[in-house]
């Protein structure tokens, strides 16, 4: 590897940016843009939608900036690790005790302690609406000394510690919580970076927090721009205007230096749901015929330009333990003959790739002997009909783990008799029993195996045919070091992330 010192040639970089919109595969080095204060420039996909309140999806921005922190974290395997809490114990089926760090300060200089945790979690537990991680969960929190809290639930909840990893349950200082219900994260977190400015939906600035309880951040700060346009985000990376870019569109990735493009497996599966209650798909043999007709590789290679993973089950590579525990699926019903059966295949336009997926699926099903009618609308105009079972088949890009990092809630919602998102209209007692068993187990190998047992039953029904697992494309300049590539999109810039002044390139 060739190491190139670039400190002296920074000033020469700007004219080079104007020469071309594409990378030169023969060019081994690209000078670093003017950024001598080691601040990371970040282009994000979506602007804040709820004033950066941690009780909304904006919480994930606060965690990706390492400004707001939770009591616990999840590691790459989905296992719990300490954060603001160092220990956790289940006292009773409905009570958990959390031991807190004693050396932590909020960005405003106030101490982190049990009182602050009780205030933050009680605010979340009594919010209207609640953060989605607390849907159906009733919490009460009490201090147990200065650096310990006890969290009570109305019913046994073996996943309570996992829930507390959600960025929506970040702990901010008392000063963040206004009398009017507004929560202000500026200068009130505990993370490695202090949020100092937010300029509406255009930009934000963060500085290194010198009083951080962990290792101080290696970068001096973060300058955030919110850039919804995918072409603009990709162009910013190409022209060295930013250092890290969220969600580069698949169509733009080939135009970038491949060394700057990093694909991150997502816990999201593109799935074909089949109506098991009415119409031609109520026949298991016809569902099996659909299953056998699908050419996943064609869809991955064409629509996704090979930037997705062919599905082996409902849970993909973003959930590492799933493949290790998956057993071959036993399909009880052989494929029947479509004999020209007319089916309605539906999807929505909000995810731009799905209508194209529908075109390829229609071709494949037609070749298998079906007659296919396509229905494509905006999601807001089609969801109610999909849930009412008005289509024979529905293509959906579905998140398979929610905020707790556990798939049971998704499986229960989509495939149980009482599921609130049961597009397949599926109701089988053995599946319900398997999901009930999994839901009652504590986190760990036994629960994971129970989840995979439930997945096997769902796949054997052919009510849902997983096609592919999506990836998100993250862009990083050649000078970025140790940016997080997180399938859950909870972390991005940590205290270890920085910009190097030395670039390693191939000879």
Regions found by a protein language model. Name each.
Residues 164-216, 221, 231:
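Gly/Pro-rich hinge or "lid" segments in bacterial periplasmic/extracellular proteins
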Residues 97, 132-175, 197:
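Surface-exposed binding/hinge segments that line
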Residues 23, 379-382, 412-478, 506-507:
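Extracytoplasmic/peripheral linker and loop segments enriched in polar/acidic and small residues
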Residues 277-319, 356-357, 458-463:
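Periplasmic-binding protein-like
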Residues 305-339, 349-356:
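Structural transition elements
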Residues 43-92, 122, 188:
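N-terminal lobe/hinge region of extracytoplasmic solute-binding protein
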Residues 474-507:
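Long beta-strand-rich cores associated with HINT superfamily self-processing modules
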Residues 209-255:
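Ligand-site clamp/hinge motif
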């Amino acid at each position: 590897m060739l190491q190139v010192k670039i400190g002296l040639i920074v000033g020469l970089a700007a004219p080079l940016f104007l020469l071309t919109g594409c990378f030169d595969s023969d060019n081994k080095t690209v000078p670093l843009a003017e950024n001598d204060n080691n601040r990371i420039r970040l282009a994000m996909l979506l602007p804040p939608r709820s004033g950066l309140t941690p009780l909304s999806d904006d919480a994930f921005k606060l965690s990706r900036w390492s400004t707001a922190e939770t009591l616990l974290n999840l590691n790459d395997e989905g296992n719990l690790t300490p954060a603001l809490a160092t220990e956790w114990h289940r006292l009773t089926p409905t009570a958990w005790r959390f031991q807190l760090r004693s050396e932590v300060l909020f960005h405003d200089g106030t101490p982190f302690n049990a009182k602050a945790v009780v205030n933050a979690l009680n605010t979340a537990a009594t919010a209207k609406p609640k953060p989605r991680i607390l849907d159906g969960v009733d919490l009460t929190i009490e201090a147990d000394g200065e650096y310990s809290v006890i969290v009570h639930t109305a019913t046994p909840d073996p996943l309570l510690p996992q829930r507390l990893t959600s960025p929506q349950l970040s702990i901010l200082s008392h000063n963040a919580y206004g009398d009017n219900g507004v929560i202000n994260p500026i200068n009130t977190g505990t993370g490695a970076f202090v949020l100092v400015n937010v300029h509406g939906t255009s930009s934000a600035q963060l500085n290194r927090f010198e009083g951080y309880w962990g290792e101080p951040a290696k970068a001096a700060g973060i300058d955030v721009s919110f850039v919804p346009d995918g072409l603009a985000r990709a162009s910013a990376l190409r022209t060295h205007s930013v250092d890290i870019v969220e969600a580069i569109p698949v169509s733009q990735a080939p135009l970038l230096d491949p060394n700057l493009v990093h694909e991150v497996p997502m816990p999201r599966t593109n799935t074909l749901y089949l109506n098991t209650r009415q119409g031609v798909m109520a026949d298991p043999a016809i569902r099996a015929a659909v299953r056998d007709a699908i050419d996943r590789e064609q869809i991955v290679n064409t629509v996704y330009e090979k930037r997705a993973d062919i599905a082996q089950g409902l849970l993909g590579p973003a959930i590492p333990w799933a493949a290790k525990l998956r057993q071959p699926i036993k399909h009880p019903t052989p494929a029947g003959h479509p004999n020209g059966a007319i089916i309605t295949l539906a999807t929505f336009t909000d995810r731009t790739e799905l209508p194209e997926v529908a075109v390829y699926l229609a071709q494949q099903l037609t070749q298998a002997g079906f007659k296919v009618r396509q229905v494509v609308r905006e999601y807001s105009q089609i969801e109610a009909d999909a849930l009412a079972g008005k289509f024979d088949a529905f293509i959906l890009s579905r998140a398979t783990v929610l905020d707790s990092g556990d798939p049971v809630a998704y499986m229960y919602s989509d495939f149980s008799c009482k599921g609130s998102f049961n597009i397949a209209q599926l109701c089988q007692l053995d599946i319900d029993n398997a999901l009930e068993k999994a839901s009652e187990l504590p986190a760990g190998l036994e629960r994971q195996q129970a989840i995979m047992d439930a997945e096997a039953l769902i796949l054997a029904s052919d009510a849902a045919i997983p096609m592919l697992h999506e990836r998100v494309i993250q862009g990083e300049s050649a000078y970025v070091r140790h940016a997080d590539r997180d399938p859950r999109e909870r972390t991005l810039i940590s205290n270890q992330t920085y910009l190097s002044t030395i670039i390693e390139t191939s000879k």
